[in-house]
């Protein structure tokens, strides 16, 4: 039995320079796993709570000493001498101890840091990669796939201090035959875009997720420049590269007027009009994936958008579903969206994350494993994408080590799988 000997948590810094939590779980066998937890900027209102200290005299209130203390005391005492292999039971025990609907007592950040570290400790003890152990506890042993990346190359919205309304402009290298080639394609296009921005007199500073963050005239100008970067990199639109956008529509939505405002373009749209605004973009540019194309509370808007675009475009629910199986089940019933973004810290445990992924896959919803805008060097999401056979991953741009660390981990996983000659699929297509 792999008994828990010690749990040790601490404050570290995330990619924005604010505190987050890192936790080690030590087993009596001498093995230990550790993980750190990311933080979002544009967060869904239904997400599990990220516990902050709110002490304005320290880190502007963003400290996580309370979360660290809960892990080092109450959570450790509850898990001490327990079998770390009982992932589901221990995750459920932490949820029960927390005693709230949204993990607001301990904080989802505290609980998740322990949940991931438990699994990593057992993977090390078993001498298997983390993705293999994820596959094992997900009851899909050795059913691996290397995910198609969504590579963020222009940041806007809450992820950058610029005037672009839509939050993320991404490319997907659908013509790649491996993650190594996908990364090469992404890197070449990213750097070519930087050259084009300089030629046009725009800034090449980057945003939270490593994409360029210039002030542009419109959302369409961003798409136009990315198209040019693809062509000048000697790749073909639709054949080698398609586009993906994250609207983060809840940040554009006025709940009083129930209209979406694009400040940079000085335009407003109701729910139906905004769907047709996006539809127009998909006809002009090779956009094959739209995330959060409506406000998180606008289920009817999502239903209409799915009816209009859902047969040809990947419509991703992020704030809509917040990695919560309950909201996903409702969306499936209402035929809202056709894909789900998975963020570990939106729900707060590995067990609940795996349950949501399985529910999505059973109902033929595409799954995209995702980072957050405030990241760490932790590469858990790369293993999660491979181990659950998710098919896609969204982990930022081709710069900033908090983003490239995930791509580098995927390269190593692919190399390992090739060396072991294991049977696995490279899901480098948008739809299964």
From Swiss-Prot:
MF terms in GO: magnesium ion binding; phosphopyruvate hydratase activity
Catalytic residue list: 209 (proton donor), 343 (proton acceptor)
Cell location: Cytoplasm; Secreted; Cell surface
GO cellular component: cell surface; extracellular region; phosphopyruvate hydratase complex
Pathway listed: Carbohydrate degradation; glycolysis; pyruvate from D-glyceraldehyde 3-phosphate: step 4/5
Record keywords, A-Z: Cytoplasm, Glycolysis, Lyase, Magnesium, Metal-binding, Secreted
Cofactor note: Binds a second Mg(2+) ion via substrate during catalysis.
One GO term (biological process): glycolytic process
Binding-site positions, (2R)-2-phosphoglycerate: 167, 343, 372-373, 394
PROSITE patterns in the cross-refs: ENOLASE
Similarity comment: Belongs to the enolase family.
PANTHER family on file: ENOLASE (PTHR11902:SF1)
Protein name (Swiss-Prot/TrEMBL): Enolase
Gene from which the chain derives: eno
């Amino acid at each position: 039995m792999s008994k828990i000997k010690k749990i040790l948590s601490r404050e570290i810094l995330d990619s924005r320079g604010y505190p987050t939590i890192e936790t080690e779980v030590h087993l009596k066998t001498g093995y230990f796993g550790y993980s750190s937890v990311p933080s979002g900027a544009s967060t869904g209102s239904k997400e599990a709570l990220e516990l902050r200290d709110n002490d304005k005299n320290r880190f502007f209130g963003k400290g996580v000493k309370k979360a660290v203390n809960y892990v080092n005391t109450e959570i450790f005492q509850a898990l001490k001498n327990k079998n770390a292999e009982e992932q589901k039971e221990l995750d459920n025990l932490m949820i029960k101890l927390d005693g709230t609907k949204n993990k607001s007592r301990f904080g989802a950040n505290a609980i998740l840091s322990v949940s991931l570290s438990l699994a990593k400790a057992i993977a090390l003890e078993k001498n298997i990669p983390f993705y293999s152990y994820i596959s094992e506890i997900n009851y899909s042993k050795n059913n691996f796939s290397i995910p198609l990346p969504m590579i963020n190359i222009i940041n806007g919205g809450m992820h950058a201090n610029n005037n672009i309304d839509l939050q993320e402009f991404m490319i997907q290298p659908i013509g790649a035959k491996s993650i190594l080639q996908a990364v090469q394609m992404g890197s070449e296009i990213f750097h070519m875009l930087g050259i084009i921005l300089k030629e046009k007199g725009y800034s090449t500073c980057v945003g939270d997720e490593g994409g360029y963050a210039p002030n542009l005239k419109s959302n369409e100008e961003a798409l136009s420049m990315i198209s040019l970067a693809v062509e000048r990199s000697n790749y073909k639109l639709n054949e080698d590269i398609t586009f993906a956008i994250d609207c983060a529509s809840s940040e554009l939505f006025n709940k009083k007027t129930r209209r979406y405002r694009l400040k940079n373009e000085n335009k407003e749209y109701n729910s139906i009009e905004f769907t047709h605004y996006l539809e127009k973009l998909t006809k002009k540019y090779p956009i094959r994936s739209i995330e959060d194309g409506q406000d998180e509370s606008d289920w009817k808007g999502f239903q209409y958008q799915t009816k209009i675009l859902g047969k040809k475009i990947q419509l991703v629910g992020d704030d809509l579903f917040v990695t919560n199986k309950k909201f996903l089940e409702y969306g499936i019933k209402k035929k809202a969206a056709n894909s789900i973004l998975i963020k570990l810290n939106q729900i707060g445990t590995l067990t609940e994350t795996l349950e949501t992924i399985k529910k999505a896959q059973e109902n033929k919803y595409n799954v995209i494993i995702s980072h957050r805008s405030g990241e760490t060097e932790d590469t858990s999401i790369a293993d999660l994408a491979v181990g659950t056979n998710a098919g896609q991953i969204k982990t930022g741009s081709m710069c900033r080590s908090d983003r490239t660390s995930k791509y580098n981990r995927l390269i190593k996983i692919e190399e390992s799988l090739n060396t072991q000659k294991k049977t696995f699929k490279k899901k480098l297509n948008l739809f299964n």
